[in-house]
Amino acid sequence: MDKKKHGTVQSADETIAAAGFAGEAAQGKGEDVQSVAAEERIRQLETELAAKEAEAAANWDKFVRERADLENYRRRTQKEKEELLKYGNESLLQDILPVVDSMERALGHADSESLSAVIEGIRMTHGMLLGTLKKFGVVAVEAERGTVFDPAYHQAMCQVEVSELPPNTVVEVFQRGYLLNERLLRPAMVSVATVPKDAA
């Protein structure tokens, strides 16, 4: 009986040991599952990180290219601006050169021709020059005798007492004024009428 008991005890010990081994095995299996899940998550995060790094590199490359394009654009526009300032008057000057030629021809004939022919040549040259200026948007400021004085377009050089013109009107134009595309290029220099003292 003792032997039976002893065998039963041994059998119970073996059962407990076997159960312990089974529990450890199950626990080991659970740790293996967790380890596999963690490794899977790490691989997923590494893949996402690689994708984000590639996207960041592509964005950086795009930024660098666009920055270079912007710098090239700035340099090109600066060069164009300098060229425009340097040669912007080229077509105007090409149109003025024939006027210079006409004046030189008129001066060349001044000795050999009558005064009336020289005056006619000067009139023609003056007309050519005004036509060229008009082509480029330059027109004379209205400033004839009797025109109402306008300080936006006229510069009063002096006041003249006159009875035949209303006060604050142009008496005489000393130098014509000009507009460039409706913006004042230079004012007309004029004398302005005032009421005579003896009439006041």
Curated annotation (Swiss-Prot):
PROSITE patterns: GRPE. It is found in: Cytoplasm. It comes from Geobacter sulfurreducens (strain ATCC 51573 / DSM 12127 / PCA). This is Protein GrpE. Belongs to the GrpE family. The keyword Chaperone applies. PANTHER family: GRPE PROTEIN, GRPE PROTEIN HOMOLOG, MITOCHONDRIAL. Homodimer. Its main location: cytoplasm. One of its GO terms (cellular component) is cytosol. The gene is grpE. Participates actively in the response to hyperosmotic and heat shock by preventing the aggregation of stress-denatured proteins, in association with DnaK and GrpE. It is the nucleotide exchange factor for DnaK and may function as a thermosensor. Unfolded proteins bind initially to DnaJ; upon interaction with the DnaJ-bound protein, DnaK hydrolyzes its bound ATP, resulting in the formation of a stable complex. GrpE releases ADP from DnaK; ATP binding to DnaK triggers the release of the substrate protein, thus completing the reaction cycle. GO terms for molecular function: adenyl-nucleotide exchange factor activity; protein homodimerization activity; protein-folding chaperone binding; unfolded protein binding. Keywords: Chaperone, Cytoplasm, Stress response. One of its GO terms (biological process) is protein folding.
